């Protein structure tokens, strides 16, 4: 399902839009004939990050400040920058931890936007330093390993970067 979610996000991004509020309520799953299909809904916080093939600049501000569902929004959204491709993919990582992989986000019981932002920044710094202990604490069993590789790729993205969606999808391929 992670691969389908990346594919759906890629489709949205291909039109120059970011979703800005990925959460479990905004991801519908349908099973028919043994085939699982995933759909992203609720485009109320969608943003146009690309106009005439020019990416919006990274400009923190009040326009988009903390918009979205607090436990899942990206650092970009916390500081008020227009959500970009990187933002949606970070958002997806937190969503996967809490929803698909049955983990617990360290900031889920924090109140206030600033403490949540600081906790996310700390987690991202540990991921960037290749310390997987932060994800081990969030997630049961071995499921953190693939997500750790995914989150490394995401935290290494610059605001305007176009992600390598194929590589991100391959992280979640099931070994046969």
Per-range role (PLM):
Residues 155-176:
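Terminal C-lobe "cap" of eukaryotic-type protein kinase domains
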Residues 1-2:
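Activation segment signature within eukaryotic-like protein kinase domains
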Residues 30-67:
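Activation segment/activation loop of eukaryotic-type protein kinase catalytic domains
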Residues 5-12:
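Conserved hydrophobic alpha-helix
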Residues 32, 75-140:
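Conserved C-lobe activation region of Hanks-type protein kinase-like domains
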Residues 13-31:
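Catalytic-loop of the protein kinase fold
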Residues 141-153:
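Conserved C-terminal C-lobe helix
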């Amino acid at each position: 399902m992670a691969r389908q979610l990346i594919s759906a996000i890629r489709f949205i991004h291909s039109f120059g839009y970011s979703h800005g509020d990925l959460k479990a309520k905004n991801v519908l799953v349908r099973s028919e004939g043994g085939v699982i299909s995933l759909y992203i809904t609720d485009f109320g916080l969608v943003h146009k990050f690309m106009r005439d093939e020019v990416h919006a600049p990274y400009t923190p501000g009040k326009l988009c400040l903390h918009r979205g569902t607090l436990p899942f929004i990206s650092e970009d959204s916390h500081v008020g920058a227009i959500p970009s491709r990187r933002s949606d993919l970070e958002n997806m990582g937190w969503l996967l931890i809490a929803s698909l992989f049955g983990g617990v986000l360290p900031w889920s019981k924090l109140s206030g936007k600033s403490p949540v932002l600081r906790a996310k920044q700390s987690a991202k710094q540990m991921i960037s330093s290749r310390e997987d202990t932060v994800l081990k604490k969030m997630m049961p069993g071995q499921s953190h390993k693939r997500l750790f590789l995914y989150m490394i790729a995401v935290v290494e993205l610059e605001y305007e970067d176009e992600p390598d969606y194929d590589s991100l999808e391959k992280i979640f391929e099931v070994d046969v």
